[in-house]
Amino acid sequence: MRKKQVFNPFLPLNEYIPDGEPHVFGDRVYLYGSHDHEGGYTFCMDDYTVYSAPVDDLTDWRKERVIYEADQDPAYPELCYMYAPDVVQGNDGKYYLYYAMSGDYGVGGYTCPISVAVCDTPAGKYKFLGHVRNKDGSPMMRYVCFDPAVLNDDGVIRLYYGTQYDYEEQPDFPENDAYVKQEMEMFGRTREEILSYPDSIMGPVMLVLEDDMLTVKEEPKHIIPYKVKGTSFEAHPFFEASSMRKV
């Protein structure tokens, strides 16, 4: 029998998956995202779970499994929650999960490198692989490592991330020390680090990864202006949760 209607919400009423990232792998679409707890006191308290449906029948969703748990990350339990993730198929055919850790109410969520986990299947049990790193092996901490999105662009692995507030748009920045101190507290950086960026430590950035899915191949750079006043982005500036699609 032909189905004529798709209902929303399509997930169970006690399931909360914000920051949704749907991806088609094979003949199914997989929905990845953060995982809020019903009645929870802060963001993203539950481990990552995945739902999927046939690409030709988006009424037939099923819960796959919990694919990754916060305590698999070495930052746990100091940071015990996982924020907006993304998944990509690498050039080796494996699946790679990118995410950032955080604490209660987002505390600490801007202070750690981007974590990576790997699995042989889209909805299997992912294993911690490592952190995005510089060529010398040190953790990559350029700009604010938050809410990653990743794209396999015909074999080129592009990683997008960042967050944005308007502190540095204020006419008295950095003379008004309150703005600098706010960034120091939020991002876990020194004053010298904050002011060392010729553009800004904030804003949406992109880097290119090696095929190992961890090592930086091309250094991060802004993809749109951080300072949006007077630009075409002024009415809709970037905030967070990069989500990229190739069209």
Q: Language-model segments: which ranges?
A:
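Carbohydrate-active catalytic/glycan-binding domains of CAZyme proteins
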Residues: 1-247
